[in-house]
Amino acid sequence: MARGRSSERAGRRAEALAALRLRLTGWRILARRLKTPAGEIDILARRGRMLAVVEVKRRPDRATAGEAVLPAQRRRLARAADWVLARGETLGAGGVEGLRFDLIWVDRLGLPHHLPDAWRPDGS
């Protein structure tokens, strides 16, 4: 059980670092650990009219971080994003013109790395 709590704390730290990275680059954090009927979104962020669904992973490099987001999880995140878009009030003032799925991985040194538009719901 202690290992589970330790992993949970490490995951929360990674998400906090990811949110800080986003804020420092002009993104507004709309939600963290947003629960939807389709699943949880780690971070929902907005910059201008762009909305980003951000998945956060603790991994040593980009390759292993990308591999950690399996196709089933990508589909769940796409359904969760659809749910968010249908509920519009969580998006703040003004409409959204774009939606993308980003990946932020936090390496062994605790440094967050941002991969914008990491995947698309159609599998590309």
Segments (PLM) and residue ranges:
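Acidic-basic catalytic patches of nuclease active cores, encompassing PD-(D/E)XK
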Residues: M1-R32
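Catalytic cores of nucleic-acid endonucleases
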Residues: A2, R58-L109
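Active-site metal-binding core of divalent-cation-utilizing nuclease and nuclease-like domains
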Residues: L24-L51
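Active-site donor-binding loop signature of nucleotide-sugar glycosyltransferases
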Residues: L34, V56-R58, D117
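Conserved catalytic cores of phosphodiester-cleaving nucleases, focusing on short active-site segments
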Residues: I41-T64, L77
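Short, low-complexity, polybasic intrinsically disordered segments
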Residues: I104-S124
